């Protein structure tokens, strides 16, 4: 059993993109689905699909790559878990304005749901910083 499903999902995505895999399978939870949806909206992944195998649900994530000469380079340069079960990190709306000069995204769990940093700033809400990606 996984203690931190968000960290597990982020690690699976990071490892699959480093290895050049097209698809990776994540354990299902509503918060992981919300994170993956944001990654798709921001263009970090190609697509995702929730599948059921027996009595368990999974999320199949199709990773996105750029052509760099003869090699394919992952679109996700770095994806990192920020707030952890042992040490929660909360930021106010003014502290989550920009990340990596606008080239990266911070995913925040707010009272209005799981949101990217630009949308949370626009709505004027802060929250728990789940992860960063660029």
Curated annotation (Swiss-Prot):
The UniProt record lists the keyword NAD: no
Pfam families: Ribosomal_S8
SUPFAM superfamilies named in the record: Ribosomal protein S8 (SSF56047)
GO molecular function, one term: structural constituent of ribosome
GO biological process terms, semicolon-separated: translation
Cellular component annotations (GO), alphabetically ordered: ribonucleoprotein complex; ribosome
PROSITE patterns, per the entry: RIBOSOMAL_S8
Keywords tagged on the record: Ribonucleoprotein, Ribosomal protein, RNA-binding, rRNA-binding
Subunit structure: Part of the 30S ribosomal subunit. Contacts proteins S5 and S12.
Family label: Belongs to the universal ribosomal protein uS8 family.
Task of the protein: One of the primary rRNA binding proteins, it binds directly to 16S rRNA central domain where it helps coordinate assembly of the platform of the 30S subunit.
Protein name as it appears in the record: Small ribosomal subunit protein uS8
Gene this chain is encoded by: rpsH
